[in-house]
Amino acid sequence: MTDLDPNLLFIKLGGSLITDKDQAESAKADIIFALLQEIRQQLQRDPSLKILIGHGSGSFGHHTARKFGTRQGVSTPEDWQGFQEVWLSARKLNQIVVYLAAKARLPVISFPPSAATFTANHIVQRWELTPMRNVLAHG
């Protein structure tokens, strides 16, 4: 697999599509499940595809991030506590997506961006993609 693999698709399930942004931590499970079923069906039609699925945080991470102001960066112990709260909230949505993927018989592995990206001034400086590339290379 190269960086320009024509069989690799990235599909982002937008946070405003899969959550109710007006209500904190409110997932639209029926929509998520339907989208994941569509993805599985596409993979069945074309087994050569490699699909990377991402999703936004919607009413999960964004509400918590606003509460703790983590967009301004983290440096103090209080900031890191806020960062942890945002991570926990975003992880809840990710667990819902992963659970629904399993229910749709779509095997997925989660790669949280917070574990692999390094930023400065809101710009990604480095993104460790080796684990993701290894999974994609092996099916």
Segments (PLM) and residue ranges:
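N-terminal glycine-/serine-/threonine-rich phosphate-binding loop
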Residues: 1-52
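Non-transmembrane, interaction-prone segments in cytosolic or luminal domains
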Residues: 12-13, 24-31, 43-45, 59-60, ...
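Conserved active-site and cofactor/substrate-binding residues in soluble primary-metabolism enzymes
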Residues: 23-34, 55, 63, 88, ...
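Long, low-complexity, intrinsically disordered polar/charged segments
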Residues: 34-84, 104-106
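Short, active-site-adjacent cap segments at secondary-structure transitions
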Residues: 17-19, 58-62, 116-119
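General beta-strand structural signal in soluble alpha/beta enzymes
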Residues: 11, 52-55, 108-113
